[in-house]
């Protein structure tokens, strides 16, 4: 078992009643409210640390933050992390000290723009740690023992400060594992995160075991038993041996003594107003059975280090599944319910995403590898081990890693966990995946350091751009990767603008053709293109790059399938559409040609020898649809191709694409619709609504 149940204590909780009371803004100073619950014991001055985004302009540069509950002030510490282009706060880590809260109780905390800065107060320092503080990680191999000690690393160098203030401070130290003679292992590396709420107060310790250096000779799979000791006891023992492939890592966290057992329910309407998360339909009442099924599947899945829990082990696996959507199924459930069970799954899966071999750390600066630092960096199998500019070939030691990453089927594992917790681990995970997505080709095809994703499948382009934009959006301003991520995002949007949105020779269908890979090079998957359209709309909302021209151009494909002359919406969400007559021919010039070429491929039975009128019962029968006016491709499924189209149409409405409002109304008027209460992953609506 990983340390999730010790850092995130909620495995045994069932969840409070769903009805929440969020305070509404009563004055211009009010920003957002949170609900804080006590899942521990009756206590006073209870700390709660969590991440929060801020709507652009809500907390201007130089302004301070304050909090109150029941009209009484609540001590607050803000560690600012990322800002909007106007200098206002975008993301930070908030720590509250709740004066008193009974076990099982909850209180609504209103966060406001302070009228004046709080008086200065001394920050918690390392001197607050217990005199005997240490956390020791021991890795036992067949022929050696390697050890890393937090105490020795604290004594040997200056720690990195992640949080600092009067309520909480957090420090990070790191170093190689060493053998009995003190010799450093060239590959295995330990990180310790130490969060102190003050002398005699709760203390959280996090251990990360890393096997992820890039460009270090001889990368290998490591086989060992692991043990972590702290505060006079063994807090973790691996039991069966751990098999850790190169370019992976794992995490374990624990409380030194008494845990902090507060749970913070985020404010989804505010998150959506900040445009940090997809605009889910807030009218959806998530079924309790969906949460129970999630909890049951999660409990049945292995969660030990190097496991994957309910993440698909083999990411290239095709077909609908829980981890593929704008955000994974469990994150959609979490956002729409704020249920502790979904919260725990959201964090646990983010932890276990570290098990995949998609992690390359730069030995020179200890940051995730970037293409700026290594423009010829590539993880493509044709290049690894093929020269001095390329990565060395790993030695798996006879072990076949069951986990395979894939950009085309990559879940958004880490953005939301970092957003809501502010945990440094999740930030690095997000950065690792963002840069890995750009590396899977010959560097010339991505224009080296630009990191263009045009080389990949359309769905891979969609998900890679999503992850890159999330990393650029939320990486702290002072983080070395911030400028690189923003530059790569802007380079990608510029390429699409020049190739499509602003090109007089761009295709009339407004598709990303990618050689139309279906039906002998004549057809493409509109649902993959819809993923891309949603992603561009999401990127535009995040606000770091102007993607408006691309969104207006791209959204016309979704709108055209609903409203273009000669194209019946019955085929709008088909699995494939014919977009050219032969593999070497030009794309069709209009949607009517696409419809005429595609209709015969969709018929379930040969119709009578007469024209099939759009919206008619005859067409519905020929297509095997439940009712006239329905759309092909799983019209009743909340995880079907019709559902996949919904976020793209919503993005088109948000982007002001001509005809998008009419297309959305027509889409919503179809008689057969999915029930999103069990599966809300694609229940995304226009932000105008």
Regions found by a protein language model. Give the residues of each.
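Alpha-mannosidase-like glycoside hydrolase catalytic domains involved in N-glycan trimming
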Residues: 29-145, 161-176, 195
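N-terminal signal peptide c-region/cleavage motif recognized by signal peptidases
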Residues: 23-26
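Bacterial N-terminal signal peptides that target proteins for export
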Residues: 2-14
């Amino acid at each position: 078992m990983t340390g999730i149940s010790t850092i995130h204590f909620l495995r045994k909780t069932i969840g409070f009643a769903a009805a929440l009371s969020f305070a509404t803004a009563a004055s211009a100073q009010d920003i957002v409210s949170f609900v804080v619950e006590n899942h521990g014991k009756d206590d006073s001055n209870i700390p709660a640390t969590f991440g929060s985004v801020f709507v652009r302009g809500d907390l201007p540069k130089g302004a301070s933050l304050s909090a109150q509950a029941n009209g009484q002030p609540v001590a607050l510490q803000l560690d600012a992390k990322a800002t909007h282009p106007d200098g206002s706060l975008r993301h930070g880590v908030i720590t509250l000290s709740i004066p008193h809260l009974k076990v099982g109780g909850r209180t609504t905390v209103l966060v406001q723009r302070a009228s004046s800065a709080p008086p200065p107060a001394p920050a918690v320092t390392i001197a607050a740690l217990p005199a005997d503080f240490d956390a020791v990680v021991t890795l036992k191999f067949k022929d050696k023992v390697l050890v890393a000690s937090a105490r020795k690393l604290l004594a040997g160098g200056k720690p990195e400060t992640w949080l600092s203030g009067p309520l909480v401070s957090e420090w990070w130290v790191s170093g190689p594992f060493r053998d009995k003679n003190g010799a450093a292992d060239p590959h295995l590396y330990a990180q310790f995160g130490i969060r102190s709420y003050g002398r005699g107060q709760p203390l959280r310790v996090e251990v990360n075991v890393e096997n992820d250096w890039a460009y270090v000779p001889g990368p290998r799979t490591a086989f060992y038993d692991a043990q972590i000791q702290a505060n006079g006891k063994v807090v973790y023992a691996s039991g069966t041996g751990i098999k850790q492939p190169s370019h992976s890592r794992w995490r374990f966290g624990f409380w030194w003594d008494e845990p902090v057992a507060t749970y913070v329910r985020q404010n989804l309407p505010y998150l959506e107003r900040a445009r940090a998360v997809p605009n889910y339909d807030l009218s959806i009442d998530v079924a309790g059975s969906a949460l129970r099924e999630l909890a049951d599947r999660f409990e049945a899945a292995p969660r030990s280090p190097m496991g994957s829990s309910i993440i698909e082990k083999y990411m290239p696996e095709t077909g609908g599944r829980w981890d593929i959507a704008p955000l994974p199924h469990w994150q959609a459930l979490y956002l729409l319910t704020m249920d502790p069970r979904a919260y725990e799954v959201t964090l646990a899966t983010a932890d276990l995403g570290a098990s995949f071999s998609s992690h390359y750390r730069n030995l020179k600066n200890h940051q995730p590898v970037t293409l700026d630092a290594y423009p010829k960096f590539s993880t493509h199998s044709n290049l690894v081990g093929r020269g001095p500019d390329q990565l060395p070939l790993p030695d798996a030691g006879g072990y076949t890693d069951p986990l395979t990453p894939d950009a085309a089927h990559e879940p958004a594992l880490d953005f939301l966990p970092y957003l809501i917790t502010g945990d440094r681990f999740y930030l690095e995970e997000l950065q690792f995946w963002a840069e890995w997505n750009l590396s899977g080709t010959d560097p010339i095809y991505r224009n080296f350091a630009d990191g263009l994703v045009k080389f990949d499948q359309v769905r891979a382009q969609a998900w890679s751009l999503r992850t890159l934009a999330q990393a650029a959006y939320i990486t702290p301003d002072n983080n070395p990767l911030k400028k690189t991520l923003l530059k790569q995002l802007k380079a990608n949007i510029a390429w699409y603008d020049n190739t499509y949105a602003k090109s007089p020779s761009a295709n009339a269908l407004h598709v990303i053709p990618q050689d139309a890979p279906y039906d002998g090079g004549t057809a493409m998957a509109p649902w993959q293109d819809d993923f891309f359209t949603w992603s561009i709309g999401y990127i535009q909302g995040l606000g770091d790059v102007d993607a408006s021209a691309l969104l207006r151009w791209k959204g016309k494909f979704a709108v055209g399938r609903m409203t273009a002359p000669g194209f019946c919406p019955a085929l709008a969400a088909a699995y494939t559409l014919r977009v050219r007559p032969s593999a070497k021919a030009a794309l069709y010039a209009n949607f009517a040609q696409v419809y005429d070429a595609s209709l015969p491929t969709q018929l379930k039975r040969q119709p009578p020898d007469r024209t099939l009128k759009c919206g008619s019962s005859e067409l519905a029968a020929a297509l095997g649809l439940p009712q006239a006016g329905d759309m092909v491709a799983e019209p009743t499924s909340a995880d079907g191709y019709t559902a996949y189209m919904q976020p793209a149409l919503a993005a088109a409405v948000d982007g002001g694409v001509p005809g998008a409002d009419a297309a959305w109304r027509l889409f919503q008027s179809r008689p057969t619709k999915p029930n999103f209460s069990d599966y809300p992953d694609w229940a995304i609506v226009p932000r105008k609504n």
